[in-house]
Amino acid sequence: MPYKRKLTSYFPQSKRFRGAKSGMAVVKTSASRRLYKKGKRKPDRIKTYTYAFSSICTDKGTIVYMNSWSLGLGPQQRSSDIEILKSMYIRLTVALSENAASQVKTYVVKWALIVDQVPGETLVGVADVYKTCPSPYPYVQCAYIADDNHSRFQVLRSGFLSLSGNGLAVGSSTRTGCPAMKNMASINKFCKNLNVRCVYDADSATGDIASIKRGAVYLVIWPDVEIRYGFSCTMYHRNGNA
């Protein structure tokens, strides 16, 4: 039998052979097989930054600046002046102070992840982010972000934790008839698809609040009463210039 050669076209965006519109072909013979393969996109290089902190917070609230990445080649550093915060895993624990635990009351601890699109030279306070309004219940704050600040502050995630005191000091045995004490509470939350664009001063190698021009991420903790808190946060980010 005479030698025959089969000519078929191949599209790089598909694994199946289709018509001959692309101009690219695969020559199939009994002795050779030549393919024009589709190139694979290289995955993004994700860096990991872990930040841990603990302190005391009053009923005025506190704000912690999260993405203070310095410039460098390490996994906990930013690669350039633009970084993309992809996701975050946060572990937050709060506990009543001894004075609050000795009262028979229920308290609420509000928390939020907020991005500041116009950060200044110094760290903002809770009163700069939230405005308060009269509350129908004692020991409960009603707060909101003012309309003129909506373009500056955006809430990424938020929630609250409840704590209860039963009139006994922390560590005391419960007396009969006393309400249950809940002097400690915690959250373990993975926040994905954040995609926050963090822009730093190109002339600065530090990541402090004065060096970031856009995309400062804050952890806001606002309790009804003085508490102790501690958190560990793992942030996943990549180079925004790549």
Swiss-Prot record:
- Gene Ontology annotations of biological process type: symbiont entry into host cell; viral penetration into host nucleus
Organism's domain of life? Viruses
Cell location: Virion; Host nucleus
Q: Give the UniProt keywords, A-Z.
A: Capsid protein, DNA-binding, Host nucleus, T=1 icosahedral capsid protein, Viral penetration into host nucleus, Virion, Virus entry into host cell
Q: Name one GO cellular component term.
A: T=1 icosahedral viral capsid
- Which InterPro entries does the entry mention? GV_A/BR1_coat, Viral_coat
Q: Does the keyword DNA-binding apply?
A: yes
Q: Which family does it belong to?
A: Belongs to the geminiviridae capsid protein family.
Name of the protein described by the UniProt record: Capsid protein
Q: What is its main location?
A: virion
Give the organism, scientific name: Tomato pseudo-curly top virus (TPCTV)
The GO molecular function terms of this record are:
DNA binding; structural molecule activity
Question: How is the subunit organization of this protein annotated in UniProt?
Answer: Homomultimer. Binds to single-stranded and double-stranded viral DNA. Interacts (via nuclear localization signal) with host importin alpha-1a.
Q: What does this protein do?
A: Encapsidates the viral genome into characteristic twinned ('geminate') particles. Binds the genomic viral ssDNA and shuttles it into and out of the cell nucleus. Plays a role in protection of the genome from degradation, virus acquisition and transmission by insect vectors, infectivity, and systemic movement. The CP of monopartite geminiviruses is absolutely essential for virus movement.
Per UniProt, what is one Pfam family of this protein?
Gemini_coat
The question of whether Transmembrane helix is a record keyword is answered with no
Motif Bipartite nuclear localization signal is found at 1-42
